[in-house]
Amino acid sequence: MEKHYHWLGRSGGYGVGYGAPASVGAALANRDLGRFSVSIQSDGDLMYAPGVLWTAAKHKIPLLAVMHNNRGYHQEVMHIQRLSNFRNRLPNMDGDMGPVGTSIERPDIEYHKLAESMGWWAKGPIKDPAQLGPALKEAIAVVKSGQPALLNVWTQPR
């Protein structure tokens, strides 16, 4: 990255609610400088602080949030698997790999509807990659007009 503002960076809180508030804060800082802000927002992370969507809409903070909706807290899954491998044991009490971690499905969260209910322009769920380009074009126009936009993009669960 050539400029310090091209990338928000990492925090020890990544995956536990850091992403959305940090992105809205960065977009607020960028707003008066005319910089276009994009957040690749994970679904589990947003669930820690969904009220930040209202804050961005209320204060007209232009931000393009592209939801990486894999329907799970997969940082948790990867951590459990990593620790299990390190300790040479399987990650559940039944002695097989079985399900680990927390999925966010049944019911699936309609992030685009959540964002719309808080004043965002939103579209989704986007499940077909061919739909992503046109949706991005629409969302970019909305953000350039000074409003936040969210695309609920379904990705492959890990």
Task: Please name every model-derived segment.
Residues 1-157:
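Thiamine diphosphate
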